[in-house]
Every structure is written in C-alpha cells, then in structure tokens.
Amino acid sequence: MRGAYYVITALLVVASSQTSADSGHRLHVYDHDVVAAENAAAKTLPQQSLRGSRDVPDDLAHEERAIISELVEEGAKLIPRAAENVEEMPRVTEAVGKRPRVAEKDALEKASGADEASKKPRNTATDDAFQGMSTEWELELPFKEWNTEIEPMREMPEPKWSWEKRKLVHEAFVKLCAEDLNPTVYETARLWSLFDGKAKSRPATFHRQVLIQLAKENVRRDVLIMKSVESEWDRWNEVSILSRVDVLNMLLNVHFQRWKRMYNAFGEQRSKLIAL
C-alpha cells in the first residue's frame, strides 16, 4: 500500500525532527506553502504509484512533498517524543518494557463479546444476527515482539471455487465496502475462507488472531517497500528504537482496523456473497 509507505515516511520525518531537536540541530521540513488541502491530498494519494527513483517530474515531486508535509503535521500529533539515542539500547529497551501496552492475548480477552463468541460456532446463514468485531480497541506490541523478523503467515486454505466465482464475489464485495477500503481479490479470499469451510466454526478469538497476523504481514510488506528506497531506509536506521516501535505499532493498527472493517462488512453479507 502506497498510503502506508507515506505514513512511514511522514512519521520518520517527525521522529527525526524530534531527535535532531534534542541534540540541538534542526531538521529541514518541506515548506508549508506546498501543502495541499487535506481533502485534495486524501483524494490524490490512492491514485499514485510507488516511485523510488529520483527521476520524478517536478509537478509530481511537488505533489508528493505536499502530501508528505500534510502527513508530517498529522504524525506530529500522534508519535511521542523520540528516545535520546539509538546507541542507548538498554535504556530504550527498559523504557519500552515499562510503557503501558495491550499485548495480543490481553487484547483478545478484553475484546467485547470474545468470551461468549468463543463458546459457540461462528454464525452461519441460519444462525443469529452476525456479531461484528469491535473496532474500539487497539494493539500495542512491545519492542521484543518487533525485534525479530515477522514470519510470513502460513498459507490458509482458500475457498475451492473457480476464478470466475472468486472474481464475482470480489466485485460484489467491493460494492458493499466503503470506498476507502477497496479490498483486493486476495483479501476477499482471505475473508471468505473465515466464513466458509472449517474456519467458520472456529471461535471469535481465532478469527481475530488471523486478522492480527494479516495486519502484521501488511507491516512487513511496508517495511520491505521502505527498505527498497535507500534514503528512507537510512532515515529509519537513524531513528531511535522507541520511535521505530511507535511507528510499527501505528502501522499495525492502521492495517488491523482496515481488516476488521472488511471482516465486518463481509460477515454481514456472507450468505449472499457465498451464494453468488
């Protein structure tokens, strides 16, 4: 997702600015005169393609600076003050360990209706009204859980339907979703697999865990995209450990919220979609 790539860029600029301010230096941020209106930036961002090259036309470069500047301002409100230095690993690790957080297990237990839902099979077309997944709680993983390679998710069995059937379900699902979700064929298949076959009878906690893992994979891809752009990867490595954790957790929740919204949308219309 290009949007997530720009979130990383913006938050890293913010974190770098804070670190530079702590050391008595000021990091240059793009001139506010080039910042476009918020709604214009929101409309433009999804339509752009990923460009890692420096050979970018002036008008496009100008547009991207505007978008990044807009995100910098938003990021400044969200990300906490950067830790003192990357080299001070023990202090940073200790600080991260003391920060209040919601681990995966705790978050799953506290999610509304999780216990009740886990005691009975998932709703089918003939069961009670679909119980959607709460979007009011978030995850915050500690440093030790981000300090390892995010393992690719085990392949889940996809619905055994023809490509034509998958395309039909995908097109119908896109129309049901809010415009900002825009699910892909792959994402539709992942959600479909939770409401068809053996997975539909698994408890709510299992479904949440699947969505968390899918969100982690999204973060992993975002980092790989950033790594492919040398200047952004260098900037990432200059930022404090604590700030990196904040950025990763913020991205995790951006993706996790999106997956939950898509899950709820599919679940509400599951019988109609699967019957296509």
Curated annotation (Swiss-Prot):
A motif (RxLR-dEER) lies at residues 48-65. GO terms for cellular component: extracellular region; host cell nucleus. It is found in: Secreted; Host nucleus. Keywords: Host nucleus, Secreted, Signal, Virulence. The RxLR-dEER motif acts to carry the protein into the host cell cytoplasm through binding to cell surface phosphatidylinositol-3-phosphate. Belongs to the RxLR effector family. This is Secreted RxLR effector protein 120.
